[in-house]
Amino acid sequence: PLQEAKPFSLSTNGDAADVPGRQTIEIEGGRIQNSNRQQLKTAFHEIASIHQGDFFITGNQNLVIDGITPDTAVRIKSIIRKYNLLPNDSGLRRNSSACTSLPFCPQALTDSERLLPKLVDELESQLKELGLWDEEISIRMTGCPNGCSRPYLAELAFVGRGPGKYNIWTVSY
């Protein structure tokens, strides 16, 4: 027989809180690369050269640096500051996710990974104006109905259905 169910509550869909020896870095779109916005690849290379612990990717496409020792903590935090790896992003950007789509996926009907950051840029100005900057709003975009970025679980979803065309899904409470 099974044991009695233990009580639990879901308070967030985010990654675990940072504790001593652990740091979570948000990776927009889940791709570690250097871009105009952030130099993630360079920063993580520098961190990996001094860090002896673990790195792992979360279900939300973020990177956790685990096992940070007191010896390396100051240097790692310095690299994080140097490359602005903890920016004051909106709740929408923190909860955005897109599949790789074009040009990488043969099933893609339209773009998603390259388009979502631009869409979030546009929406952020409205969020700030409405006082919703810190609201944890999940937005997902996918290049086809297969839903690799889990758009059907998001509060705001764009599902590709043809070149430059998307079905828009919203959640109402």
Task: For each feature predicted by the language model, list its residue ranges.
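Peripheral terminal and linker regions in Fe-S/redox and tRNA-modifying enzymes
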Residues: 1-173
